[in-house]
């Protein structure tokens, strides 16, 4: 009984593995990353002390919109 349910669930999940779902998740991950970039949090590598991250780049200007 349980094995049958598992097989049905796998069959239902199959169409989403390569197609729409992965595209959706990739898009979501990209928008999360770009959202972090615009807020000035995402810098790789992290900025030196005294510099803030703006749009993914380090800047020594005072960044007043980051709540620290």
UniProtKB/Swiss-Prot annotation:
One cellular component term (GO) for this entry is: extracellular region
Modification Valine amide, positions: 66
The principal localisation class reads secreted
One Gene Ontology term of the molecular function aspect: toxin activity
Q: Which organism is it from?
A: Californiconus californicus
Locations listed in the record: Secreted
The role this protein plays is: Probable neurotoxin with unknown target. Possibly targets ion channels.
Kindly state which keywords UniProt assigns to this record, in alphabetical order.
Answer: Amidation, Disulfide bond, Ion channel impairing toxin, Neurotoxin, Secreted, Signal, Toxin
Q: What is known of its domains?
A: The cysteine framework is XIV (C-C-C-C).
User: From which residue to which does any coiled coil extend?
Assistant: none
Found, by tissue, as follows: Expressed by the venom duct.
What processing steps or modifications follow its translation?
Contains 2 disulfide bonds.
Span of the secretion signal?
Answer: 1-21
Give the protein name, as stated in the record: Conotoxin Cal14.13a
Removed propeptide positions: 22-38
């Amino acid at each position: 009984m349980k094995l049958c349910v598992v097989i049905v669930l796998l069959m239902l999940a199959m169409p989403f593995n390569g197609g729409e779902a992965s595209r959706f998740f990739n898009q979501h991950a990209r928008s999360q990353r770009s959202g972090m970039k615009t807020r000035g949090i995402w810098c790789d590598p992290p900025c030196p002390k005294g510099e803030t991250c703006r749009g993914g780049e380090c800047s020594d200007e005072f960044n007043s919109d980051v709540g620290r």
